[in-house]
Amino acid sequence: DGLVVDSFFSGAQVSFGNKLKATLEAGRWDLSNANKGIGATTDKAANYQGIELGYAAGNLSVGASYRQFSSDAFKVANRYNTSGELEDKATIWSVGGKYRFDKNLALAGAYAQNTKADELKKSGSVELDYKGTKNSDMGSWGAYLAYRHVGTNVSLAPTYSTDHAGGNVTVYGTKGFDLGIGYVPFKNVLTQVQYFRGKELVTDDKVQTLYGRVSFFF
């Protein structure tokens, strides 16, 4: 669900399978897309290899992935090497799933961990979704309520608009509640309002974000 990386890479991707689907990836990832805690001052891109497995049956979908990034940027990343040894790799595994109770209500969860980082190496998300927007359907709407824990040394470029790490506000990451509503007032026009309230990891400082966006689709 974008807990680890929601970003394109330069390279190759191969997918195969039906109900059980596998995706193999390899290439280079632009570190300018990484969060503020990782940065890209010592290296412009990371070597990347990954594998994803996904399975869907009825109302249930589950998945797991393994990703490896190699770059000198991890040697100087914030709280990445507190043990004293300079590690230049990120080895990240993640699992997730979603269950749809009916056409309107769904519960999703995801967890990820970087086994090479010393700190800020775990992330997790639990989200309850109600309905959902469809850009071609004027008047459609959806809402979600989530609790997220986003560590910057594992969530390198998360998809969430309100997590502060993705917005380069914090080098540590955050934990807290995230609420969002989407509405389609006109065909191919999506409006979104999101609110996050929680604390910054490490410092425990209170953080909150109110985020709004209007998107046009052609």
Predicted regions located by residue number:
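Outer-membrane beta-barrel channel domains
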Residues: D1-E25, L210
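Extracytoplasmic/secreted cell-surface and envelope-processing proteins
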Residues: G2-L3, L31-N35, N47, D72-A73, ...
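Charged helix-capping and loop-helix junction motifs
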Residues: S7-F9, A46-Y48, G124-E127
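Conserved positions at the start
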Residues: F9-G11, G50, D178
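Fold-independent oxyanion-binding glycine-rich loops
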Residues: E25-R28, S65-R67
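Phosphate/diphosphate-binding glycine-rich loops and adjacent basic-rich segments that engage nucleotide
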Residues: A34-E52, S65-Y66
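Outer-membrane beta-barrel pore domains
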Residues: T41, G54-F218
